[in-house]
Amino acid sequence: GRISAGQAKLADAQLALARSYGLASWPRLVLACQMTDAIWRNDAGTVRELVLKYPELLHENARGMESNWGPPMSYAANIGRDEIIAMLRQMGATDLQHAFDRACLQGKLQTAKLLYEMGARPARGSVMGPCETLCDTGLAFLLEHGAESSDVSGNRMAPVAMVLQTYSRNPEGKHRCLEVMAEQGISLPGTAPMAVHRGRIDLLEEHLRRDAGLLSRAFSHEEIYPPKLGCHSDHSLALCGTPLAGGTLLHLCVDYDEMAIATWLLEKGADVHAKAAVDAEGFGGHTALFGCVVSQPFRVGLRKDDSFARLLLDHGADPNVRASLRKRLRFVADESMREYRDVTPFGWGERFHDQDCVNKAAMRLIAQRGGRI
């Protein structure tokens, strides 16, 4: 049962804290902290002492709970701790393949080479990891060492779909991943949204020469996330911040943190007031500024400042334009569809149900420029 604050002892607080991390006991939480701290500090001696004293740690998740970072050797592979990896392998660690996959998706190529020399080999579907993290160097390494460009079921479109739909944001890595896919024989559509995905201003210049209305054109979800490249029919599985369906190229640039392309679009006359299309149920009509507020680049730690919002506001973006939006987040505790009717960019951020997605720096700047709820 529940313990009142007046009755609680230190041991009760310790147990509650351990369980909040998904661990059964305070001593197990302490061990997890000691192990992960030692790996981060590259303290092979402490890691060795812990494993000798508690041999089961060699095969349990380093954090003590279920985690894709894995047991200590795999955990070390994520951050390139080669000395610790070699020691743990000698001590009997068996998670060689998982460690190899983690090194590749984190771009730790020296570590991946070490694990390859130990006998790890690219498994079918292993390229999906670097595609998820947009790690072009890890992707190229796997392909150079014989990896199949497919998921575990052999679907050759799955990797490129992952690059386009992943939660990760890393413009340069994404551009290079798509070029690697093209080198693997994937035919990327010659569309303007794909030119943005690829970071190709040269291709956008060609599109603009052929289509004077390009900069104000609204693009459907399917044009942004092509089904023929394996992109999902469930739009919510394309992991963006503010909805992109029906948006302009400027909307797309904001969500993928394509600052250089956005600047080029504005120089070419893109309208910061351009609104996304409104769907049959009345949702849409938002400008690119909304995407600076509920932001996937902010969510993943890439864009913590207000510079994208500043770019748009400096070009005259209206801080009090209104729109109605709806959003379903995925792979979170609450996956329900939420609706936000008649909100400003500031109101969109103020009311959004997951504040981890809301760029507070952008909100402050919008408020300074006269934005209100």
Kindly give the residue locations of the regions a language model identified:
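Intrinsically disordered, low-complexity eukaryotic regions enriched in glycine, serine
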Residues: 1-49, 53-54, 64, 75, ...
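Ankyrin-repeat boundary/"N-cap" motif
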Residues: 31-37, 60-75, 94-105, 121-133, ...
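Short coil/turn connectors between adjacent alpha-helices in alpha-solenoid helical repeat scaffolds
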Residues: 40, 165-173, 296-308, 354-359
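Conserved ankyrin/ankyrin-like repeat signature
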Residues: 46, 83-84, 110-111, 137-138, ...
